[in-house]
Every structure is written in C-alpha cells, then in structure tokens.
Amino acid sequence: MRPHFLGFLFVMFSLTGFTQSIKFLSADQINPELLNSHWKAQWITHPSESVLDYGVFHFRKNFRLEHVPDEFIIHISADNRYRLFVNGNAVCFGPARGDLAHWFYDSIDIAQFLKSGENVLAAVVWNFGDDKAWAQFTIKTALIVQGNSAAEDIINTNGSWKVIKDQAYQPASLDAREVLRTFIVVGPCDRVDAAKYPWKWESTDFDDKTWSQAKTIDAGHVRGVGSDINWVLTPRRIPAMEQNEQRFAAVRRTSAGSAAASFIQAPEGFLLGKEKWIIPANQKLTVLFDQGNLTTAYPELLISKGKGSRINLIYAESLVDSKGSKGNRNDIENKEIKGYADQFFPDGGSGRLFRPLWFRTWRYLQMEIETGHEALILDDFKSDFSAYPLKENAVFETDQPELKQIWDTGWRTARLCANETYFDCPYYEQLQYVGDTRIQALISLYVSGDDRLVRNALLNYDESRFYEGLTQSRYPSESPQVIPPFSLYWIDMVHDYWTLRDDPEFIQAFLPGIDQVLNWFIQRIDPQTGLLGKTEYWNFVDWANEWDWDPKQRIGGVPKGGSDDGQSSILTMQLAYAVQRAAELNDYFDRPVQAQKYKLLARDLTQATYKNCWDQSKAYLADTPEKNEFSVHAQIFGVLTNTIPENEQQKMIERIRTDRHLIQPTLYFRFYLTQAMKKTGLADKYLETLGPWNEMLSAGLSTFAEKQDPTRSDCHAWSASPNYDFLATVAGIRPASPGFKTIRMEPAFGNLNYIKGQMPHPSGMIVFDLKKNGEHGLSGEVVLPDDVTGTFIWREQSVLLNGKTIINF
C-alpha cells in the first residue's frame, strides 16, 4: 500500500467565529428540480493557482437583503472539504465522505444567521492533493453553492464569487509513518504561519478587493442527467456530526529550560478556562496534557502575543517506553510521546484561535513552546469533541460493577470509531472496513437504535463493487483493496439488517449485488474437492499470531489454504455461512430458483468441508485437507454452518474454549465465538470469556484495542462487541422474525444475580428487570412496545410476551 495522506489544517478566526448548532435538511425538503436537472450554480475554483496540489482557499460572496426571510435554504459541497461561515458565524462543515459517483452535498437553512443589509457567505476549502487521506476522493479544488429556489439564487456560485489562496499553510508531520513505524493514512498535520493569515476573512467588514474573481468549471449535475459520472451531486445521507466542548483532565508533566522557572506550573484555573498561562520571552516549555480518556476532537488553542514563538502540538493514544512498549496507559514515568504534530507560529496578535478543520485523536497531547522576543499568553486550551451523534439509548445494569466498566469503555470505543463513516480506528486509518462494520452496525442498532450510519455503510459497500463482482474491503477509499471474505460479511450485514429493520425495498435492492459476490466465489470452487480453490487478493480472517505478516505478498492474518492453492476449510465455511443467509433472503423476497440454488450450494460446501477436513483422531476440523493445522476459527464456523453435526456442536465449543493447542482467535474473532456459544446453548458461559477485556481495563485503556498487547491501535470498535452481546446474549434479546416484528428473549445470566435495562426497538423501547431466584428460578418483568410480541425462554420453559409481562419461573 502506498502512503497517500489527507492533511489536516487549522483555520484561524476571531472569537466571534464560534461553532453554531445547525441541522442538515433531509432530501424531501430539497427542491425537486435540483434532484432532477442540472443546477444553475457552477463549480468554482481559483483562476490561476494549482487546483490539483495541496492548497487552502478562502471563498467569499457579498450580497444584500432588504429584509431577513423566514427561510433561506442553500445546498453546498466542495472538493476536498469546506467549512462555511455566514456573517462571521461558523455554520457547518462537510461534505460527508463519498465517492465521485456519490458526491454528497449539505442542505441547510441559514436564515437565522442573516440580517437586513449587507451579508457575506464565506467558505474555506482545502485540497491535500497527493497527501489526502485514503478515505478521500478528489478531482480538483472546487466549491459549489446552490440556492433552493429563485429566492436564494443570489448566492449561487459563479464568477461573482471571490477567492484567495491562503499562504499561511504548509503540510507537517509527513514523516509520521516513519516516526511511529506503522501504517498511517490520515494525512499530514499543519504548519501554520499566522503572520500570513488573512484575519477576519469571514466577516462582513473584511476588504476583499484584492482577491481574484473565481473561475467557473461546470454546472452541478445530478444522477441520470447528462453523461457525467464525476461529482454526481447526492443529498447527504447522515446527520451533522456531534460537537461538544470538553476540557483536559490534567497536566501530567511539565519541563522548562530552567527547572526553577516560575512559569513551569500551569495556573490553577487554566484547565478550567479561568486563568491565563503566560510564558515569558526567550523560554522553552513542554507540557503533557492528559484528556483522561481517548477522544476525537478539534483542539482549540486561544493565544495572544508571542510573536516569534513556535508551538508544537503532538498527539498520541498512549506513551511508550524506550523499547516502544505502551504498558499501563495511565503511567507516564520513563515514557515519551510519539505521534503526529501540528506547528503554529504566532503573529503577535490578540485572541488568535487555532482549530483544525479535521479532528485529531489523542489521550495525551504534548505542547512544546519556544518563545521569541515577546511573551506568549495562553488564553485558553480546550477541545471540541466530534463524532457521529450516536445516542446511548440502551441501558444495561447488573450486580457486577466491572461489567459497567466494559459497557462504558466499549461504548466510547464504538463512538470514536463512528464519524462520517464507520472507522476501523480513529488514529491511524479512519477507513471503513466490512469486517469491522458488521460488528459496529450491530452495536449501533442495539445500543442507539439509529440506523442511518448502518444504511450508509451498506450502500457504501454496494457502491464499491468493481468489475469482478466483489465489493471492496473498505470504502470509501481512493486506494482500492479487496478482501474476498469481507464481501461475504457484507452479505451477512444485509441479512442482519433484514432481521432488525422492516425495510424490504431497501434490502431487496441488494440482491443483485449479493448474486454477483457469490458468483465470484462459485467460479472458484474446486470441482475435485468441493472446497474453495485458489482465491485471489487478501483472504484475511483474523490477526492470529500463527498467521504472520508476509512481507513478500504484503498480507497477514491469512489461514493455511488462503494464499496458495486454496482448499481452506475456514474460507469455504465462511462462504457457506453467507450462502445460507442469501438463501433466506431469496426465500423471503420470492426468488425460489435462486433460493434453492443457494440452499443446495450451502449443503455441498459444508459436506465437502466435513469430508475433506474432519480429522477423526483429533475430532477437529482441520484448516485444510492436509490436516496439519487446526484453529478455533474452523471449529467456530463448523458450528455456525452446521458443518459439524448438531449433536456434536456443544461438546466442540466446550473443548475449544480451553484447548490452547489450537490457533486462537483475537478480540475481533471472539465475536463469532460468542455466536457459536449461543447457538450451542452455552450462552451462560459468555461472561467467563471476558478476561481479555478486563485485562485491557487493568492496563489503563479507556477504549478497547485492535488486539491484546502488543497492539498498534488502542481504539478498534470490532473489540467493542460486548456492548452488543450484553443485550443480545446476556439479556438474550434477538429478532424472531424479519424486521424485528417479533422478538425472542432468552437471558443467559451466568454468575449474575440480576439484569436490568432497556434496548431501543423500531417501535419503541424494550424494558427488562429480571432477578434470579435460587439456583433455577427467575422473576421480574419485560415490557415490549405496543405492536411487538415475542417469546421469553428460561431453562426450556417459555411464556408469551405482549405489552407488560410478569416473569415468574
């Protein structure tokens, strides 16, 4: 993979440029003409500067209103991204990440920011060229703004807009990959020279006479109109990102050129924003801030004076010792910070606010200051938390407080890995991978109930399909990557959504794509063995220790049979697992021929796997017919697909939980182990498997890691699966029919004495309060939404659920 980057830069504006809370409008509020014809507005750019290379540009449009209208709806987009100001007020940023055939625009009513008389729309637009993030598509630097009707056409982008390139910005931290010695594709940080910045450029009284007239490129176009398929303007599918002010928990360490320096300690009220911190001229100061928890946020540094100073901000998930080990994340002794960094050069002005247009990820943030001939005043330092606005609508309470810690930490992990798309991790990649997303989507639906980001992800992957029929493994991504098993997980995601949401039209549209994915695999089945033969690309399954990184092929996590001549039992059963779900979908949507085809295919795949890979002496499924490698993964999918006879499945799961001779699953694949435990009646053992999560908490992690130490990423939402399983396994709430129209609730208490909580359902809230009575008894109540019924099961006894039901076994 080649290192392309998306840079993050800092927009500087006066204190009046604070962030406003605003909601994007939905597609049904858009003028229908704009959905079905070319826009009057033109894409615009700078007339002479390079529009392909790194650059930051400011655009302005002055206009006059005789009176303030009740509504003033505009639609805005940019390449790469924009931040919009109206009369000096920061209004919104975007567009949401998509691809060239789905270039999203934002629809907003800006009437609340307008005034009678002179008004100005101002937008900063940036393009990071070759340094852009891998998740960012681009054509060239451009902006488009379209009024919703004739009343708003006055602000349409055309040659009347003005533009200037901002010379204050240069990319920084281009060596982050080498510094951290790992894969990073979120782009460079920013070197900002405040003396070159056009202060107050976003305000109405700014003089833009020296700015250039914008150059027009082409009219905005929508899908199906004309022949163009780039910058296809598409209404935003997700809400605005949440933004909330947050402050640092502590200053953990300071050092200065002179240990006795009086300024070395932060003033008592500084972290609360109540006192300034003055750094004298010609001094050096290093300050280590601790957020207390990992966060994704826009740091906001407010300073005055300090001309000739230099400020570095270094961001890290954790500190490391001399050997590169993270150890306990709370400990800082004999540890240093390594991470990407921003650089600021103050101009001596007052009230200068430095804020990135894209967020940073950190728990620890180190500020390094070197002042020049003028003292530097730190007026304030805080941050603006930003993530997808998932609400924690579910509640899960028990008599074991450590489960509350796992719940809270898992939810933080899920939140930091959800933005304009789901992220695998917020620090290193910010890419949406199918294997991660399946778990993240279930967490979102069970804990929040918000399905918009889930729907967006399902569409993203369907839109990623390339000519061979497979979906890409991650999307949006300007660097294409193919992991064939992830195309299968996309099918599983569609099936998950079908069981949890009553949206048949949305689901049915994916069936042709499912057929394409499965046809790709069918063509690669070995007719001699019935197993999957050689399958191209990266057949990732899990980051198991035995499945090492292959530097020649540049792949890892691949089981035996996944990267040579095929015959992998795991990959074959993953195919069978997806085919079984495809058969159910085709049955439901009245495609009997296709459904029967998939049922027979699933039968053939499982029979071939058992015939070729079952080792009678070991009583395990081998990873290949050679029977010289055995993994927990193969047994898990042997159970999930019924490749292993049903009467042997429970015994199998009991064995693999303790047999360390097998290749072991990481945090990611333990999600599938849990599903196998549920299937075999061993859900009561689930809480016994949470040791790795408790170990992470003991190591001071505030989010769950990519894998157990040593790990690259401290925040990976595929490891937040307990937030789903506390509700789906411990509380035992699962759909009993498509669309979640009926439920099945079979709690698995393990060693708990009571569980209490609630879970969002499309029709309302499922509420439960249950307590064990002695060894076998259970009492309490379950409340379902009005139009939902279900079955409650306890130790082979059952009762119908309807409205409020008293439980007494």
PLM region descriptions:
Residues M1-K23:
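Bacterial Sec-dependent N-terminal signal peptides
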Residues S21-Y427, D436, R452-L453, A457, ...:
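Extracellular/oxidizing-compartment recognition motifs
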Residues D79, R360, Y428-D436, G449, ...:
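Aromatic- and histidine-enriched alpha-helix N-cap/loop-to-helix transition segments
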Residues N156-D166, A172, Y364, G372-T409, ...:
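Active-site acid/base region of carbohydrate-active enzymes
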Residues D175-K200, Q265, L600, Q607, ...:
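Non-catalytic C-terminal accessory modules of carbohydrate-active enzymes
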Residues V186-P188, V192, E429, V447, ...:
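C-terminal capping/lid segments that line or modulate ligand- or cofactor-binding pockets
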Residues Y298-E317, L365-E368, V434-S464, V494-R501, ...:
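Alpha-helical support elements that line or immediately flank enzyme active sites
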Residues I491, W498, A576, A582-A583, ...:
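Heptad-repeat amphipathic alpha-helical coiled-coil interaction surface used
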